[in-house]
């Protein structure tokens, strides 16, 4: 596998350096979608290419890429394989949270996470999503014996049957929360079978359950505190990376239309309009990453969602009936685009997308 790596073996998130990796991911995206298998080889390729080191500073063993450069990398990766890119967001979110903590456990695990020899994922969605309306935490933490006792479950953990570690959030009865790093072979931790999804089934996302799981003090990454995710590096849900993945998927879909437009002049204008919109969204994304105020992150997320859905459906229309046959990339992109309507989607963004779909937008 020739990834055209520099002398240190670590690829930077630039187009020339990532080209070999993204071509490999793109070639495997269709078979991965069809099989629903865990992308072992793709994740290994990313680890060997140094992708995990983008997210951590050199003082902790990474290369400390800027937020804008990381988003540039995500734009390329998601245009190649959304399933692999989504998995990376969860793994690197966990990695960044581990690297930012002063917990005693960090030094024992960080290098293996950076190299991809060990994998960690996030179990935090229940702290911010719809389960909150139940009034009772679905994953509780009870103080005792110098640590905490966890009971309950985390409903959406990506790669749960394959990861070595989980960064998990739990809530104490008084409303404070903790983040902890636990090995998946810890007594009392069990994994449900992954949920079959409309797309991205290969992410093997499912529930992880905790039955009287003892957490020692040295495994507490953050907390106890109220809203432990607020300001937590790498542990927040959603964000600009989600918009980057949607814009990257749109890039791939528009590319299909552009291919068809070479021999069909009626597709030239739609392809050009969508490409221009995608370019503006990309520039606004990178502007936000560098402190610009071209728009709000929420506004960009709504636009990115819309662009992903419209461009993928336009690609399906452009390739006609062939795109409706199982295995065609246009059909896969249509299904994958719908993921952005439900993945870490803030309510104002949901409302904006609903208004557009119902022709209620101004």
Predicted segments, located by residue:
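Glycine-rich phosphate/cofactor-binding loops in nucleotide/flavin-utilizing enzymes
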Residues: 322-362
């Amino acid at each position: 596998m020739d990834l055209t790596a520099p002398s240190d073996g670590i690829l930077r998130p630039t187009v020339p350096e990532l080209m070999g990796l993204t071509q490999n991911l793109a070639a495997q995206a269709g078979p991965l979608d069809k099989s629903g298998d865990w992308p072992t080889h793709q994740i290994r390729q990313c680890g060997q290419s140094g992708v995990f080191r983008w997210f951590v500073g050199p003082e902790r063993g990474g290369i400390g890429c800027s937020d804008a450069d990381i988003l540039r990398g995500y734009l390329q990766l998601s245009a190649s394989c959304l399933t692999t890119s989504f998995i990376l967001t969860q793994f690197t979110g966990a990695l960044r949270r581990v690297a930012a903590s002063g917990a005693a456990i960090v030094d024992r695990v960080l290098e293996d996470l950076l190299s991809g020899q060990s994998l960690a994922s996030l179990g935090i969605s229940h702290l911010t999503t719809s389960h909150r309306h139940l009034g009772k935490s679905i994953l509780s933490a009870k103080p005792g014996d110098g640590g905490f006792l966890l009971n309950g479950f985390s409903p959406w953990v990506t790669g749960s049957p394959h990861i070595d570690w989980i960064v998990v959030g739990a809530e104490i009865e008084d409303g404070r929360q903790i983040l902890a790093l636990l090995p998946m072979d810890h007594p009392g931790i069990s994994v449900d079978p992954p949920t079959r999804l409309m797309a991205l089934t290969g992410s093997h996302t499912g529930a992880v359950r905790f039955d009287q799981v003892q957490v020692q003090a040295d495994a507490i990454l953050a907390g106890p505190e109220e809203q432990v995710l607020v300001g937590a590096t790498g542990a927040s849900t959603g964000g600009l990376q989600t918009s980057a993945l949607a814009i990257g998927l749109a890039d791939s879909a528009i590319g299909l239309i552009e291919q068809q437009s070479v021999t069909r002049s009626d597709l030239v204008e739609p392809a050009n309009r969508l490409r221009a919109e995608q370019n503006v969204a990309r520039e606004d994304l990178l502007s936000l990453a560098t402190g610009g105020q071209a728009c709000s992150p929420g506004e960009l997320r709504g636009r990115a969602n819309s662009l992903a859905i419209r461009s993928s459906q336009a690609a399906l229309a452009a390739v006609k009936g062939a795109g409706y046959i199982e295995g065609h990339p246009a059909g896969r992109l249509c299904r994958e685009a719908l993921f952005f309507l439900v993945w870490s989607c803030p309510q104002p963004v949901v409302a904006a997308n609903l208004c557009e779909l119902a022709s209620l937008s101004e």
